[in-house]
């Protein structure tokens, strides 16, 4: 737990990726992204091209994808995260379980995954953000900064919520999320974030390692 917390505290670039079933290159992609500077890599297949083509990811296949990402994360000294599924997180030996506002309560998740797995929580308004900062989550995310196809129909609170998070001056790690890419990153940094979650900025890149490197370098320069 202590090593995971130390890795989380130093983390700046958090990547959510699907299982890349339509491409069949998850292992190669993960290695490239992590080599480029990704600090946390999370499997999130909801709404992915693979889901649209092949249907929802079955638990057995999700666990297999988790094993690929967990192995890559270990080799690169990064953290591996599972989205929503406490059972998959436990079975896969994940470092992190990330939960949304409608997912398992943190206390229930903690009892299920044990004391050593880090817990993250999404927040979408000031009240949720303040509760996440004060509560038992090990880190929290704020956003979306911009509308994103990853969360269709969800209003984006924008950079105002990022500014509010920065004004909390909390010692707990937090990440800005939602529509962030290399072009928008300077605005996010100006709003006070020093950690970000990205999806398409790396998953859609022709060169995932270079895309990750560009983001990681910009985040490092802003410390």
Curated annotation (Swiss-Prot):
Q: What is this protein called?
A: Thiamine-phosphate synthase
Annotated signal sequence is none
Hey, which family's this protein in?
Answer: Belongs to the thiamine-phosphate synthase family.
Q: Which gene encodes it?
A: thiE
Entry binding sites for Mg(2+): 84, 103
Pathway(s) annotated for this protein in UniProt: Cofactor biosynthesis; thiamine diphosphate biosynthesis; thiamine phosphate from 4-amino-2-methyl-5-diphosphomethylpyrimidine and 4-methyl-5-(2-phosphoethyl)-thiazole: step 1/1
Enumerate the cofactors the protein uses.
Mg(2+)
A GO molecular function for this record?
magnesium ion binding
């Amino acid at each position: 737990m202590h090593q995971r917390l130390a890795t989380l505290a130093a983390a700046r670039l958090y990547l959510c990726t699907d299982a890349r079933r339509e491409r069949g290159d998850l292992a190669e992609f993960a290695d490239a992204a992590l080599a480029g500077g990704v600090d946390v890599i999370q499997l999130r297949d909801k709404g992915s091209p693979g889901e649209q083509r092949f249907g929802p990811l079955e638990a057995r296949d999700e666990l297999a994808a988790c094993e690929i990402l967990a192995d890559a994360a270990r080799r690169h000294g990064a953290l591996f995260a599972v989205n929503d599924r406490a059972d998959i997180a436990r079975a896969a030996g994940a470092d992190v379980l990330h939960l949304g506002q409608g997912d398992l309560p943190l206390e229930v998740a903690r009892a299920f995954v044990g004391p050593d797995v880090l817990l993250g929580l999404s927040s979408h308004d000031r009240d949720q953000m303040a509760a996440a900062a004060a509560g038992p989550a090990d880190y929290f995310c704020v956003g979306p900064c911009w509308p994103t196809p990853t969360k269709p129909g969800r209003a984006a609170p924008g950079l105002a919520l990022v500014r509010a998070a920065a004004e909390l001056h909390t010692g707990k790690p937090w990440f800005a999320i939602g529509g962030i890419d290399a072009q928008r990153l300077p605005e996010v940094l100006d709003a006070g974030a020093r950690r970000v979650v990205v999806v398409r900025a790396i998953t859609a890149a022709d060169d995932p390692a270079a895309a990750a490197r560009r983001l990681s370098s910009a985040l490092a320069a802003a410390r």
